[in-house]
Amino acid sequence: FQCPYCAAAHDTLKQFVAKHQDEVTLVYKHYPLTPIHPEAMSAAKAAWAAGQQGKFWEYHDALFSQQDKLGDTLYLEIARNLNLDLEKFERDRTLTTNAIAPDIQLAEKLGISGTPFFVMNGEIFSGAVQLSDIEEIFHRVQ
């Protein structure tokens, strides 16, 4: 959630998914690159905790829209704005390491070294891709 390329890709991906909502399923995997993004793990944990209350995507969007403010103050502010149960949110944030670890292990197993990273019907692409690039890949792999 701290990666500027991920933020750019996020906006493009939202457009793509909105256009093809009946044709694609978006699966999100956490891969916080903590050596270069010190808030990445904390943000991932907060998003996962929000997901336990059915608000992952709303929380995810809020994090990217306020990427320059990442930190505990923002995480709680977003949780409040989304009307999350704050006690459950805080409790779930402490349990997330085991939940996010499989995503990290999968990325490492696949040899992923950076984000954003995408797989569409077996085709791999990465970076802050343009909508036209995603459309081209989508039509090729259908």
Short names for language-model regions:
Residues 1-80, 113, 139:
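Structural alpha/beta surface segment adjacent to cysteine/selenocysteine redox centers
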Residues 5-17, 76-142:
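C-terminal cap of thioredoxin/glutaredoxin-like
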